[in-house]
Amino acid sequence: MFKIRKRSVPKETLKGILRKSPSKTSKVSQKVGFVDDHGKPIAEYRDFPADEGDEASSSDSHYEKKAPLVINRSGDYQINRMKWVVYSVKNVKKQNDEPSEMRIMEENRLTENNISRAPLFGTFDALDSPNLTTDAIIRARTPVPIITSGSSPDIPQCVSPVQNTYQQIFENNTDTSDEVQDFSIPPPPYPSSFPAPTTPLLALMSQLKQRGIISGEQNNQPLDNVNPMPQQFDRRPSRWTQGSWKVDRICTYYINRPDKCTRGDNCRFKHDDVEREHRQKEIQSSRNQSWHHRTSSHKYSSENSDHRGYRRHRSRSPHARQ
């Protein structure tokens, strides 16, 4: 009998991107990824052919026959000079070498306005004025000694600015100093009499009295040297804290709070003691009606009253303060 063996199909060898020495068992060329420093993208690979003596099983027979001779003749440092094979790889961003639309617009704007975006070294924009050029030529032709032969000119004296002193500001020319003022000297007395009013002033006052703007009765009181203007303090309006400005309402804080009103006599509202006593009695009676004795389901003896399980409550009972 003949024994039939099932023929197995060899699997395709995986292609790695790492650089390895060509294996004797592998007949497929390796693909090695690299980063070129000449601006080429990463999606470029180079084929390393298999050994020359082995049978070629790859479709890239051209490179397998031709490249090994170059590798054998050249040294290890010359392998990078071999020809590169570029493969098209999907989903790779295309390198854009053209300028963008905004870059083109900016370049056109600079060209139209004659503006140099990045001027070269050693160049500058000079103001070429004919007047300045003529003046420079005349000055260059005029000989000027380096060291002056004559005496140096006198420095012009600057006029000192006017300083504002106390004598210029005030009318009196008394010397001011930082000495302590002597208060032992009494001030000059206040004048007891004033000059009589003039005729035009009297005529004006009589007209105002006829129209009723000024009252006809005026008390001509003599002025006092100590208090020369007593009417100034009499006509001053009293403050709101005084009794004449109190509101005809009872102060709520005075009748409700146990400590009375905190403002005292300066309060704007009235402080009625009778109303306060009546209100305090109502508050105390409402407290007595709302208070209930605490009933507990557990009875504690006098011995265990101060131990665990006993809870002290703050009572509003009128007998608690006794």
From Swiss-Prot:
Residues 1-63, 278-322 are annotated as: Disordered. Residues 309-322 have a biased composition (Basic residues). A zinc finger (C3H1-type) spans 245-274. Disulfide bonds: none annotated. Keywords: Metal-binding, Zinc, Zinc-finger. One of its GO terms (molecular function) is zinc ion binding. Gene3D superfamilies: Zinc finger, CCCH-type. Residues 34-49 have a biased composition (Basic and acidic residues). InterPro entries: Znf-CCCH_4 (IPR041367), Znf_CCCH (IPR000571). This is Uncharacterized protein C50C3.1. It comes from Caenorhabditis elegans. The lineage of its organism: Eukaryota, Metazoa, Ecdysozoa, Nematoda, Chromadorea.
